[in-house]
Amino acid sequence: MAADQKTLLDDLTRRMDGALESLRRDFAGLRSGRASPALIEPVRVEAYGGEVPLTQVGSIAVPEARMLTVQVWDRSLVGAVERAIRDSGLGLNPAADGQTVRVPIPQLTEERRGELARTAGKYSENAKIAVRGVRRDGMDQTKAQEKKGDISQDDVKVWSDAIQKLTDQYVKRIDEMLAEKEREIKQV
């Protein structure tokens, strides 16, 4: 494998990893039946004259399978944390208990599970589109190098095959991540 090809594949791998990481973040925000700190980490709280991430005003814990707690560091922000979680659109109903905000995770209805599975499917399709876009960039770079005379037609074939193989690996990983997320969502 030529150094240029290795450099190109490393760049494409890095960019495809970015698409996978983005999918992981999207999936973390999808509520399943189990409690996970990632569910409420993106919530922003009105505090100190602006909006700050929940993780900057308290620590999130999972004391039980269907319960999250937020230990708020500044007692004056307990109400703001409770409001932010309630208004987050996640369908959660937090309750303040001293400096702790308890967040019970309700059982998902079958209809809601279906919606979440469809949303997960959309997220995975977006990740596949991103991976295919990276593949297209790689193929374009390969063809441009051939036009400049830097590589032969045989090299173009070898590089294109390597890029396609890399793309197939990432699409397979995305499908595996989707299957795992759907199992998690459907689990009662």
UniProtKB/Swiss-Prot annotation:
SUPFAM superfamilies: Ribosome recycling factor, RRF
Key words, A-Z: Cytoplasm, Protein biosynthesis
Chief location bin: cytoplasm
Gene Ontology CC entries for this record: cytosol
Subcellular localization: Cytoplasm
One Pfam family in the UniProt entry: RRF
GO molecular function per UniProt: ribosomal large subunit binding
Gene Ontology process terms (BP): cytoplasmic translational termination
Family classification: Belongs to the RRF family.
Annotated PANTHER family: MITOCHONDRIAL RIBOSOME RECYCLING FACTOR PSEUDO 1, RIBOSOME RECYCLING FACTOR
Known role: Responsible for the release of ribosomes from messenger RNA at the termination of protein biosynthesis. May increase the efficiency of translation by recycling ribosomes from one round of translation to another.
Descriptive protein name: Ribosome-recycling factor
